[in-house]
Regions:
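Short amphipathic helix-loop junctions that connect adjacent transmembrane helices
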Residues: 44-64
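Helix-loop junctions at membrane interfaces in 12-TM secondary transporters
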Residues: 108-120
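Intracellular juxtamembrane helix-capping segments at the cytosolic ends
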Residues: 130-143
Length: 200
């Protein structure tokens, strides 16, 4: 009898790569931090700006903030599903960052009250839809089963630190130098993040 010999091929384990040695991921995390740093102005300094500088009533401010959530709820999944896998995620994140930057800079470019705030909010919503859903998925696309926790931890840390520093920095800039300066800085920071995302 001829015995067949089956050679057992062992699957090689995934290479365990540290996120701290992943140069492109570090650049990505820096861009995510810049994005989040400016993004949190939406919930802190922007409502104050609406009330003090645009003289909006609290009811109007509440309507604008609710509109943001309603539009995202209604359209985000449809839009994301239609473009997911068909476009480079980094380019989409970059586009979203540009739109968010414009939603801030518009305050320094045009006079206005509620209409200006409404236009800014709608631009902001589109920017969020094109960027936020893809950020975490892009980060996780660089991982394997062995280092996913490390990559996720660094990503979460970027958002957590930005949530602490962003609102504090924004309010201090607005208090000491005025809202116009604050919008130039925050809008410009969004554009810097957009350039970083597109570079990757």
């Amino acid at each position: 009898k001829i015995k067949s010999v089956h050679k057992v091929v062992e699957k090689k384990p995934d290479v365990i790569r540290s996120p701290y040695r992943d140069k492109n991921y570090i650049i990505y995390i820096i861009c995510v931090f810049l994005y989040a740093f400016t993004f949190f102005q939406l919930f802190t300094t922007q409502p104050v700006y609406f009330k003090r500088e645009l003289n909006l009533a609290e009811t109007s401010i509440g309507i604008l903030m609710a509109l943001n959530g309603l539009v995202i709820t209604a359209f985000e999944m449809v839009i994301v599903h239609s473009i997911d896998g068909k476009r480079n995620t980094l380019q989409l994140i970059s586009l979203g960052s540009v739109l968010l930057g414009l939603s801030y800079l518009i305050f320094n470019l045009f006079p206005g009250g509620f209409i200006l705030a409404l236009i800014s909010t709608l631009i902001c919503v589109v920017g969020e839809i094109f960027s936020l859903p893809f950020m975490n998925s892009h980060a996780m696309s660089r991982t394997n089963a062995h280092n996913r926790g490390q990559y996720a931890g660094l990503f979460t840390m970027a958002w957590a630190v930005a949530q602490v520093l962003g609102p504090a920095a924004g309010s201090q800039i607005a208090y000491n130098f005025g809202f116009a300066t604050m919008w130039w800085i925050m809008g410009g920071t969004f554009l810097i993040a957009a350039i970083g995302f597109s570079y990757l």
